[in-house]
Amino acid sequence: MYGFGDMIEKLKANPKTIVLPEGSDPRILEAASRLLAGNFIKPILLGNEDEINKSAENAGYNIRGAQIIDPEHYDKFDEMVEQFCELRKSKGMTPEKAIPILKQTNYFGTMLVKMGLGDCLLGGATYSTADTVRPALQIIKTKPENSIVSSCFILVRPAATGENEVIAMADCGININPNEDELVEICGETVGCAARFGVDPKVAFLSFSTKGSAKDDTVTKMQNATKKAQERYPEIPIDGELQFDAAVSPRVAKQKAPGSPVAGHANIFIFPDINAGNLGYKIAQRMGNFEAYGPILLGLNAPINDLSRGCNALEVYSMAIITAALA
């Protein structure tokens, strides 16, 4: 497992509060107990207080120190309803409509972040990705400079000696077929996320073609996206379009992309679509012995992240650290 040492040290100096909507789930409770023991992230558990405490006690998890909030008995609920109606007034939101929506912990938790009562949110242990992302889009919304929410995976291959190998892949989980401008956004957001893991970026825009070796609309898309990204981020080494072997193998790079500032040693990989991205990170995870952390949602005004419903407590703990570190 990736050590998260630098992130934890920074969080100890400046602890963050993370909202956990599925507060009674045993995996969430185990992760929360570990976070509390480390004293660098303050969890807010959402749900029925008696149910949460009973679940923790039965499982032997110490959650003393965690804040527990029940949407059914929240003293600022009227204020939350008012703010939510204001946010959604263009959609015809009324208090009558808002109340049952905000009783759902995914919406309630996202509003806590919006109101400044939590720094970030991690959900999805039982909620679907759509049920985690939808409230984020409606309430937190994208940064002014962004038009989309995207995602990346951070992949870590532990080294027997020396430093771990850390790479990033995007977009593997949100945008099905991003256009040129969206790929540029995905690139910038992924570089920023990878920097939190100490990655010195070398970005490859991937394709089945290298430097015009094949002709296709998808190749043209990656060529144009590369040029736009180079113009927008001139300080970052970016190249494309590159096949994966040219991006990672110095020997192949000499043959296929001589003189490239990236080919042969890329560490951030921008895929043409979600098919390639999703397959790519899973191949790296299952056959390349990389640990995969994500999907990490990018482009929002505050960190909101989504777990796999098949996650374990260690994955919840790891994603909580990543989410808080981005706050």
Enumerate the predicted regions with their spans.
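Anion-binding alpha/beta catalytic cores of soluble intermediary-metabolism enzymes, centered on
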Residues: M1-A263, I268-A327
